[in-house]
Amino acid sequence: MVKEQFRETDVAKKISHICFGMKSAEEMRQQAHIQVVSKNLYSQDNNHSPLLYGVLDHRMGTSEKDRPCETCGKNLADCLGHYGYIDLELPCFHVGYFRAVIGILQMICKTCCHIMLSQEEKKQFLDYLKRPGLTYLQKRGLKKKISDKCRKKNTCHHCGAFNGTVKKCGLLKIIHEKYKTNKKVVDPIVSSFLQSFETAIEHNKEVEPLLGKAQENLNPLVVLNLFKRIPAEDIPLLLMNPEAGKPSDLILTRLLVPPLCIRPSVVSDLKSGTNEDDLTMKLTEIIFLNDVIKKHRISGAKTQMIMEDWDFLQLQCALYINSELSGIPLNMAPKKWTRGFVQRLKGKQGRFRGNLSGKRVDFSGRTVISPDPNLRIDEVAVPVHVAKILTFPEKVNKANINFLRKLVRNGPEVHPGANFIQQRHTQMKRFLKYGNREKMAQELKFGDIVERHLIDGDVVLFNRQPSLHKLSIMAHLARVKPHRTFRFNECVCTPYNADFDGDEMNLHLPQTEEAKAEALVLMGTKANLVTPRNGEPLIAAIQDFLTGAYLLTLKDTFFDRAKACQIIASILVGKDEKIKVRLPPPTILKPVTLWTGKQIFSVILRPSDDNPVRANLRTKGKQYCGRGEDLCVNDSYVTIQNSELMSGSMDKGTLGSGSKNNIFYILLRDWGQNEAADAMSRLARLAPVYLSNRGFSIGIGDVTPGQGLLKAKYELLNAGYKKCDEYIEALNTGKLQQQPGCTAEETLEALILKELSVIRDHAGSACLRELDKSNSPLTMALCGSKGSFINISQMIACVGQQAISGSRVPDGFENRSLPHFEKHSKLPAAKGFVANSFYSGLTPTEFFFHTMAGREGLVDTAVKTAETGYMQRRLVKSLEDLCSQYDLTVRSSTGDIIQFIYGGDGLDPAAMEGKDEPLEFKRVLDNIKAVFPCRSEPALSKNELLLSAESIMKKNEFLCCQDSFLQEIKKFIKEVSEKIKKTRDKYGINDNGTTEPRVLYQLDRITPTQIEKFLETCRDKYMRAQMEPGSAVGALCAQSIGEPGTQMTLKTFHFAGVASMNITLGVPRIKEIINASKAISTPIITAQLDKDDDADYARLVKGRIEKTLLGEISEYIEEVFLPDDCFILVKLSLERIRLLRLEVNAETVRYSICMSKLRVKPGDVAVHGEAVVCVTPRENSKSSMYYVLQFLKEDLPKVVVQGIPEVSRAVIHIDEQSGKEKYKLLVEGDNLRAVMATHGVKGTRTTSNNTYEVEKTLGIEAARTTIINEIQYTMVNHGMSIDRRHVMLLSDLMTYKGEVLGITRFGLAKMKESVLMLASFEKTADHLFDAAYFGQKDSVCGVSECIIMGIPMNIGTGLFKLLHKANRDPSPPRRPLIFDTNEFHIPLVT
């Protein structure tokens, strides 16, 4: 079946809200067109037609193209379908409402059907229910409250009857424990029931214990009668909406039969028969069972038979709705799995996620991608084959009629052509493959629509899955080219995360002019050069472009005139074709004129004199030697002055993505997106041309080690092995000094791992010294285009230590890693050290270890992809409808305020030039000074500068800037003025003195024009950095946190410097934080000390915090048996207590023993001297003295004598800042409150990484800060930087309700009201049935709901309701009236 767009009428209507509810039996009958009674599908005559009153009756719609519906007469595409109904012989439970039915039964009296509350309580709850703004969440909470209150009562307030507990028993059965009585309360009904068994008990004693277990079976018939008798005034207390359904509607007495179009019969040609839908078959089974029960009732069969049939009918009705029921008895289990209604809705392929939230679309194409550096970065090459199929509906008007006529004449086979014409007044489309195209072209009129082929310059959307962030789908301009692949400039690989090893990408063609405009402005490649994650450029030069630019800008690259002109000519194409390039003056004049590569690179930035771009940049390169700035020996300090490269060779830092010192980023920020994109396109053409002419390749010769290198490598290996042997020897002789918190074995492992890891690094640096600078792998590593020094060192010198989960290869079987080695061997080779290089080849054991490490990486990647994908989906679902409003707040779709001002300052993370800051003042000032030298103006002194800046900033233009931003500017200007004063004082220039101007010009000088321009630029950039109202800040936040997650690892890392203090990082840690887990895997409390420079004091406090058990400080704990007494003797080790700095003595131990859960009274514990404690057990009736003594002996060592029981251990951490050692405690455990209250700990500076613990101790704001800090800490540890505004938004969303809500299905249900949104996330059926029970109304305002309903969402361009069109005539023109003409003006005769 083709999915058609559903339009009932031609009048535009908008869905304002959706009400959920339950249909009563009467409403079902009114909705249905026929009653279905026949269990047979087809009549037995020859033509095999559907049976009347059967499940396939054609009055319920049609599922065949050639048969019209018998009710409305429409065909398959237009008929919506009509319902039928089946009357059930006996009522059944509705599986979706089963929990609700039990809930109601627990709330009402099973005798009089009133709700089990007193009149006062009823009144109190009813008053609360009358509140107008009662939300869905409050309703659900209230129902739980009322239910809890009712379940505590067992006597009805209305009739005084006794009510037992109601619970589920078996499959779809409910029992009422009516006769399970408490001795105190004896209900007359219960007592008469018990009395009726008295004679039976006398004859058979076994009956008595079973009496209390007697239960009343509440079958659907009983329940239905109870529900019908519930008084109308009590129904609101069940939280049901009387308009949406009554309690009796929860029980099925009638089933609706859905229309045929949703359960079509498929006629198979192979065998003469049809394939019926699961629903159809299930309905026939239900009708069959109905008939069986009817026959049995009429013929008077045994009750047990009817009950069994009833159970089976009940099961079939349940499977019809939800076929994944658990707990079906084996004799009733269905033979084959079928799809019920719930299965059609739930899951990724269900209606909600598969057909409503996301669909397959027309006007799209997909094929393999290839690189093409000759395209501009905003272009994509589309194959002719695709261009002929994708069409755009263009309206005929005066300007394009001739062009469109030409296309119509070309027809569908020739490109550019057209496929269809739709004439203005008819709805019919005419296919241009057939018919007289010349005639059709001549008949084209204004207003007709021509579906023309895709042509050059069309806006298309280009996308690669997985779409992890908004830059995974961008708008490009199409260029129709031959061949069969999509091609685009390699600069755009990074945002798509694409490579050309067989990746495929999708292309969509927008179908309206508005869509094209919106795509170009909001999704255009040029508009998305930077990532919203932190404002770093993503679209930038990669791989070959970097290598080419690096080699081009080396110090020793020279060209003669012909070569220089030839290379520069490669940029003269497309829109740059006509520009006049000014060849700069040659650098070397004699003996031959030569130009440098740096000059040619400058042409890329500013090709002609009439180009206004004057970019300025000063930054360190990748190999900067650390001093001398532009006099760096490696020529790696890049200086660009007014678009001329003065020094430095370009590398990944200055051309590639991920750095804000990138030249394209400077162009984008100072000169706009078009200039940056043009420069990138010029580089993408010039670099490959230069590189292919020069030649650049890699071969085995590049990775062959020389003799010197091999010798150095063996020396390194021997030294390293020798050191390892010394460590192993020290362990064996017991001389190895243990690291704090580690066993001797762990210490040895850590030392050897450290020693062996260094070998590879040293071998790598030996490689670099040895290799020629023209070596290809070295060049690539130096300019950052591919690979690193470690890769080179692994290829040439030594592969190094293989680590598995951060440690050496573990022993597998029989205490060795492989059978090639001795048992318990600790040698480097036996534990995964690979001494060979890839060039020399690996031995079998080395190869095995290397594959172990590689496999770990692969498994990690596979697991991580699924984990992060689900995490991203949860984040997007919870954050999607957050949007910045016109009053600068961030609100959800229901109007809840999440933040009063986005990120605290309302600035856009994508527009940040510094780290989380809108501007980098120094760079702006340097740029202003270069562009406006103002040589003739006098320089300002310190005071003049401050006064001048102050007066400019008092102007009205600066009122729109935040105070904090103005303070930042003032602070910067003050620093600059101080620097100027210092320089002037140094050279003895006073403020009013005169000096030779040329000397003054060389010094730091700022003129009035410069300071004015500087402040103007700052203000301008600040205003541009404002977050625009309507931005989907929530979705951006979700993507900015989810997308780096895919690049993280799943591992647990060690704390730097502290052995074995494990801390979870990576994806599991992010998952813990956003799930708001109460028990996290590694809770760590960081405690600052009152005296942080005293190691002894730190040990003392550590003793107070760390849990110390009696067994750890006792020399022995023994039983003592005397003739008349027995007790346990505990001897304390005073030496150990003294060494550990514990504040423990015999008295405190006695107190601890009494306070523990050992049930020992203070009189039973005696203290003898300083170190002896006697514990005398008490005999009890249950066990003998001997056993009590044994229990005591076993449990006494576990008594906590000092410290916090939840803290397993504490480690002293040493910070070496500014030469001073600072001590703090890292506490493993969860009791933050107790740690903060410990004497010696600075409570105000103590933090925990457990959000729940912080919220419990310090409140919600502290929890919010913890979430921010923990996410940022985890990201920084993995080398990711995320703008703090994103993390702030996430933490605000998690905490804005006053409790920490996780981004899980439970947290989401507490944040969001919308049923559709929750149903489209998880637990689809549960949410829909709940909504029907409560009679919930969904106001369709969030993003998910709007997409499901096909309504524009109120985010972005959908935020405002009225678009003000400017420059219109203020007053409408006066139209001539009918009586204005002169003939009506009869002169009056006086």
From Swiss-Prot:
Keyword Metal-binding among UniProt keywords: yes
Residues that bind Zn(2+) 1: C69, C72, C79, H82
Sequence positions that bind DNA template strand: S326, K348, R353, R360, R366, R1305, K1323
Record: residues binding Mg(2+) 1: D499, D501, D503
Region (Bridging helix) residue spans: 844-856
Known EC number: 2.7.7.6
Domain of life: Eukaryota
Signal found in the keyword field: no
GO CC terms: cytosol; mitochondrion; nuclear lumen; nucleus; RNA polymerase III complex
Binding site for Mg(2+) 2: D499, D501
Keywords: Acetylation, Antiviral defense, Cytoplasm, DNA-directed RNA polymerase, Immunity, Innate immunity, Magnesium, Metal-binding, Nucleotidyltransferase, Nucleus, Transcription, Transferase, Zinc
Matches recorded under SMART domains: RPOLA_N
Transmembrane segments: none
Binding residues annotated for RNA, in chain numbering: R464, D503
N6-acetyllysine carried by residues: K445
Binding-site list for Zn(2+) 2: C109, C112, C156, C159
Gene Ontology biological process: defense response to virus; DNA-templated transcription; innate immune response; positive regulation of interferon-beta production
The reaction(s) this protein catalyses: RNA(n) + a ribonucleoside 5'-triphosphate = RNA(n+1) + diphosphate
Cofactor(s) for this UniProt protein: Mg(2+)
InterPro entries in alphabetical order: RNA_pol_asu, RNA_pol_N, RNA_pol_Rpb1_1, RNA_pol_Rpb1_3, RNA_pol_Rpb1_3_sf, RNA_pol_Rpb1_4, RNA_pol_Rpb1_5, RNA_pol_Rpb1_clamp_domain
Cell compartment(s), UniProt: Nucleus; Cytoplasm, Cytosol
Assembly with partners or alone: Component of the RNA polymerase III (Pol III) complex consisting of 17 subunits: a ten-subunit catalytic core composed of POLR3A/RPC1, POLR3B/RPC2, POLR1C/RPAC1, POLR1D/RPAC2, POLR3K/RPC10, POLR2E/RPABC1, POLR2F/RPABC2, POLR2H/RPABC3, POLR2K/RPABC4 and POLR2L/RPABC5; a mobile stalk composed of two subunits POLR3H/RPC8 and CRCP/RPC9, protruding from the core and functioning primarily in transcription initiation; and additional subunits homologous to general transcription factors of the RNA polymerase II machinery, POLR3C/RPC3-POLR3F/RPC6-POLR3G/RPC7 heterotrimer required for transcription initiation and POLR3D/RPC4-POLR3E/RPC5 heterodimer involved in both transcription initiation and termination.
Name listed for the protein in its UniProt record: DNA-directed RNA polymerase III subunit RPC1
Organism from which the protein derives: Bos taurus (Bovine)
Gene: POLR3A
